Amino acid sequence: MKHTRLFHCASDEEIKKGETTDVYFARTKQVLQAKNLDKLRVVAEVTSGKLPRGWPWGILCGIEEEARLFEGCPVDVYSMPEGSVFYYTDSQGVREPVMFIEGSYGEFCVLETPLLGLICQASGVATRAARVKKAAGEKLVMAFGIRRMHPALSPMLDRAAYIGGLDGVSSLSGAKAAGAKPMGTMPHALIIALGQGQVDQVKAWKAFDEVMPPEVPRVALVDTYFDEKIESIMATEALKDRLYGVRLDTPGSRKGNFPELVREVRWELDVRGYKHVKIFVSGGLDEEKVRVLSEAGADAFGVGTSVSNAPTIDFAMDIIELEGKLVAKRGKLGGKKQVWRCPKCMVDSVLPFGSPQPSCPECGGKTQPMLKPFIKKGKIVAKLPKPVEIRRYVLKQLKRLSIEGS
């Protein structure tokens, strides 16, 4: 059999044509067409199931790709803006839609699978990234997790991590998708290779300093051969004021008390007059470990698999109106809806679409509609903001949220 592609990835055209859908949607379309019912006008909404691990909120991501998916398809789409906080239910326990689609069901039924795939994974990554950033506060957090995932996904994963609030991403393609510069330090392989069979970390640190342009921070990896404390001292003595930071990437089998190790390194650097040298940590980090290591004195974090392989958000799409009549399967509520949010309290109220604007149930203040026109008759009518703008929006919302609770 002749190979038609190098990697097992669907093309843009295949996704747009619905060739990545589940077979039962293709059969549904076939049945509808055979019975002349493919023009039935429906409203279908997207809601989430309970959020992973008791998370109290999520960050909606993947909406720009959603726009590309539905562009040219004769439907109307209302959606929360990309980067919006969403909840499983509103303040009264009503499931919260993040978008709805209105049009002939035969026109978009085969797009349900890619629709959900585009937002389920990206929203999970963005949400985990936001939780990690919330735990780190103002300290630097970088996404280091693409090596654990299929390389075709690196732009999406790094974009979602950046939108979620992380300060930088490691991949070249991911940085391009995020509109940011790639960030990173140095691998153990560089230190081993530069040693040419000798234990000579200093040679690698100095070579990096000599070759890299001035704008690249000098962050020395300090756990290749010796104790992290010893190598940190060696690195500072080798590069002096040119050294921006040291990175501790200790294998899990040797971490022991990682916070205590951070405290030791910080002490040894400070007493030698190297208070300017930052401590970067990486390896198996999540929001709780970031919080603990931050308290111990870590200045920056490289977060990998916990973000790139974050739990997906369990979004589902359900028909809620059929030819103007309210319908719904068991466990769902019929009728088109609007989500009203108090920007001060971040409290939501879900009401039938067209209902009068409610007041915030907590503070009595004004609320704002979250589901806004996104696509009209197949044309994108909403602004598609740049990733840096979406990230700014996410960080603004995070100021009013906690990662605790359920």
Give residue ranges: language-model regions.
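Ordered alpha/beta subdomains of enzyme catalytic regions
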Residues: 1-216, 242, 316-406
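Glycine-rich phosphate/ribose-binding loops and adjacent secondary-structure elements
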Residues: 189-354
